[in-house]
Every structure is written in C-alpha cells, then in structure tokens.
Curated annotation (Swiss-Prot):
HAMAP family: Fapy_DNA_glycosyl (MF_00103)
Originating gene: mutM
Description of how the protein assembles with itself and partners: Monomer.
Matching PANTHER family: FORMAMIDOPYRIMIDINE-DNA GLYCOSYLASE
Cofactor(s), names only, from the UniProt record: Zn(2+)
Enzyme Commission number(s): 3.2.2.23, 4.2.99.18
InterPro entries: DNA_glyclase/AP_lyase_DNA-bd, Formamido-pyr_DNA_Glyclase, FPG_cat, MutM-like_N-ter, Ribosomal_uS13-like_H2TH, Znf_DNA_glyclase/AP_lyase
PROSITE patterns: FPG_CAT (PS51068), ZF_FPG_2 (PS51066)
CDD domains per the UniProt record, alphabetical: EcFpg-like_N (cd08966)
Protein name: Formamidopyrimidine-DNA glycosylase
Single GO biological process annotation from the record: base-excision repair
Function: Involved in base excision repair of DNA damaged by oxidation or by mutagenic agents. Acts as a DNA glycosylase that recognizes and removes damaged bases. Has a preference for oxidized purines, such as 7,8-dihydro-8-oxoguanine (8-oxoG). Has AP (apurinic/apyrimidinic) lyase activity and introduces nicks in the DNA strand. Cleaves the DNA backbone by beta-delta elimination to generate a single-strand break at the site of the removed base with both 3'- and 5'-phosphates.
Length: 270
C-alpha cells in the first residue's frame, strides 16, 4: 500500500511535467473506484490551469482555478506521466491530459479515488481531522509526549493513527521503532520525553531516507517515472521475522497487531 514516502515520490515525479499547464481533456475509463469519480469533471477540468501540486498525508492535491482534485492511491494505485500515443492498460482508469503529456492513473484493486472540492480543500471530510505532517515543524517531541499521556494503546498503533500524525504506515512504524529502541507493544502513555525525542527523530529519518530512495516496493507501487522504489533493500526489521537482528544477531520476533505484521528485536527494543 503506498504510504507517505511513495506518495511524496509520486508527487515529485509527476509535478514538474504538469505544473502550470492547462488540462486539455479528462478521460474516465472506469469511474467506479473507492468512491465514484464525479463524471462532470470531464466537462469542468478542461481549460483549467494546474496552479499547485502538493501532498497532505497520503493524499495528492492538484489545485486548479476553481477547485482542487484530491487523489488517493488506495492499496495498489500509481500515477505516471505518459505520451498521448501510449495505449492504456487494463487497469488504467483515468487520463488527465495536459497537451502532449498525460497524467495516467493505474489501480488494479480500485481502492483509490479522484474527488473534487470547490471550497477549502483542508476542510474536506477526508482531511480536516488529520494530524500534523511528520516532516513538518508541528511534529515535535513535546507534541508526541503530550498526545501520548494516559494512552493505553500500543505505541505502534498510536503512531499509525492519522489523527496523531499522518503517513506513518506499517513498514515505517516498524523501522522507526527499531531505530528508536522502543518495543512496538509498549504502551504509548509509558513513553518518556527522551523516548519521544528519539522516536520523532527516527520517524523523520526513516521517512526522509525512504523518499530519497524512491519509496518501498513490496507489491504494486511504482513511482511517477514508472520505476520501483529501493528502500526495501534497506529495511532493518520489516519482512525479516525470524532472521538475525542486524545489531545483536539474535532472531527478530514477528507478531500480529491489529492484523498487521509487526517485527521487532526483544533485545534491542525496550
């Protein structure tokens, strides 16, 4: 499932090709995604200029003259830039034409979306309750410490809650907690200020390093240039249950938390 680094990688890959250009056509081949694509967009978008392209959590935001297109990649979605002569594949569900280049959306499992908001996009129902960006100034050790007080849920579940902080998906939660030396099953409310400092630092580091590597490719994800991400080659714990810890050489423990794979070192993480 594309997470924050994959979405950021996509944004950086496609935006230079379309920013400032006008939409010349919107071709919707399959409107039935997680939520139906508004068919009226085919008439509304042509002629509008792409003013800005940004990311909020795992959502891509394309800002035009009269509103904002909100795109989510779902479980298996990807966006890529193609030439007009390149024929669509079976799972390519919509094309946003910008003259001689096309922003093409592919989604085999169809859990993604293309929605439209004419008003303040940050007040959209999908965005207004989101927590701070993990790479932004508002995500601080003090913030994490205060939000975690009296919380009895496991710290891994806590940092994966998008109302606490956005974009820390399962892979990156596993990796960040290992680097910070914190067991994923530790109660969030039991974190000290020093632990919060370490965890914020390592969440930032892991996400930034993944962005630099183009994201993590486990199944369907490819970046905006159609190439896979390479962060998977640097994973320390995720997907390595039973293998030797790269720090202490003891076997990594794998458990299920909220039906998600969780891997950690019982020696290095406290």
């Amino acid at each position: 499932m594309p997470e924050l680094p994959e979405v950021e990688t996509t944004l950086r890959g496609v935006s230079p090709h379309i920013l400032g250009r006008k939409v010349t056509d919107l071709v919707i081949r399959q409107p039935r995604l997680r939520w139906p694509i508004p068919l009226e967009l085919s008439e509304q978008l042509p002629g509008q200029q792409l003013k800005a392209a940004s990311r909020r959590g795992k959502y891509l935001l394309l800002s035009f003259n009269t509103g904002t297109a909100l795109i989510h990649l779902g479980m298996s979605g990807s966006l890529r830039i193609v030439k007009p002569e390149e024929p669509p594949l079976f799972h390519d569900h919509f094309d946003m034409h910008f003259g001689n280049r096309i922003l093409r959306y592919c989604d085999p499992r169809r859990f993604g979306c293309l929605l439209w908001e004419a008003g303040d996009i940050h007040q959209h129902a999908l965005l207004r309750d989101l927590g701070p960006e993990p790479l932004g100034d508002d995500f601080t050790p003090a913030y994490l410490y205060e939000r975690s007080r009296k919380r009895t849920q496991a710290i891994k579940q806590f940092i994966m809650d998008s109302k606490i902080v956005v974009g820390v998906g399962n892979i990156y939660a596993n990796e960040s907690l290992f680097m910070a030396g914190i067991k994923p099953i530790r109660k969030a409310g039991a974190l000290s200020r020093h632990m919060c400092e370490d965890l914020v630092r390592d969440i930032r580091f892991v996400l930034q390093r993944s962005i630099t590597q183009g994201g993590t490719t486990l199944r369907d994800f490819v970046g905006g240039d159609g190439k896979p991400g390479y962060f998977q080659q640097q994973l320390l714990v995720y997907g390595r249950g039973g293998e030797a810890c790269k720090t202490c050489q003891k076997p990594l423990k794998e458990i299920r938390m909220n039906d998600r794979t969780t891997v950690y070192c019982v020696t290095c993480q406290q």
